[in-house]
Curated annotation (Swiss-Prot):
GO terms for cellular component: mitochondrion; ribonucleoprotein complex; ribosome. GO terms for molecular function: RNA binding; structural constituent of ribosome. It comes from Dictyostelium citrinum. Its main location: mitochondrion. This is Small ribosomal subunit protein uS19m.
């Protein structure tokens, strides 16, 4: 479902009050926060449940959510099974 227009966009309070002058690295666990123009050309470190992953903010990512750029599940790689030769 789409968020109601009258509510506005959601940005976490920890991101709204962040002062990049005193601390240049932005660290958050809020994957549901919307990327706003204030963060353009900055790197935000988002927690994926195991570690913090850096997300570089560009113009294409404005208006999208931080969680879209951080995978929370490991991509499974299957190994090819070895075929046994019969003699």
């Amino acid at each position: 479902m789409v968020r109601s227009r009258w509510k506005g966009i959601y940005v976490a309070k920890e991101l709204q009050n962040y002062n990049t002058v005193s601390n240049p690295t932005i660290v958050t666990t809020e994957r549901s926060s919307v990327i706003i123009p204030y963060y353009l050309s900055k790197t935000i470190y988002v927690y994926n449940g195991r570690k913090y992953v850096g997300v570089k903010i560009t113009e294409k990512s404005l208006g999208r959510k931080l969680g879209e750029y951080v995978l929370t599940k490991k991509v499974e790689k299957y190994k090819a099974s070895k075929k046994v030769k019969k003699k």
